[in-house]
Amino acid sequence: MAFRWRSLMRFRSTTRLLLLFTFCLTVIHSLGNDVDSCDKLHLGQYLCKEPRIDDATQEPETCKDRVAWVECLPAPNISCRLSNGTQFKFSGEEVGFNKTIPCRNVSGYSYKVAVALSLFLGWIGADRFYLGYPALGLLKFCTVGFCGIGSLVDFMLISMQIVGPSDGSDYIVDYYGARLTRLSITNETYRRMQPSP
């Protein structure tokens, strides 16, 4: 009976030591790996360079499939893991990671030209011919812009960028100019409830 009691006490003390050892290893491991990947830095911990803008398209030169890549520099004294797994402390001058930014698919149709054609020559359908809608352009030409009312409606639709080029691309708009962005509501959209008075 005494033998069982002693072996039970040894087992308990060994179990306690093993648990303490496991806990210490877990704490040391978690303290050593608190550095995240560089692409998971929070806003304010990095600064992304401005993309190089193509003069012809007014979009980033690296734009492909509506996405462009820019280089991001972590702030000074920020430590993070590079893509190859090494930990690095940045001085603010080194590139830490690349980030994607949205860009637009353009194919040569200028917004300024489309609005000017719609305003001055919309009554003969020049705007619709320019945007690639020859049937509507011919119809506007034959009806003198639907007696002016169609020209006014087309001018409003083109200036609000509702009517765009026929190939589905976007207008060429100055990169830092006034661009319209369509907002949509989906099932993931958060709606804040208004307090009732």
UniProtKB/Swiss-Prot annotation:
A Pfam family annotated for this UniProt entry: TM2
Transmembrane regions listed in the UniProt entry: 106-126, 144-164
Name of the gene encoding the protein in the UniProt record: tm2d1
Superkingdom field: Eukaryota
Stretches assigned to the Extracellular side: 33-105, 165-197
Subcellular location: Membrane
Cytoplasmic side: 127-143
Protein name: TM2 domain-containing protein 1
Positions of glycan attachment: 77, 84, 98, 105, 187
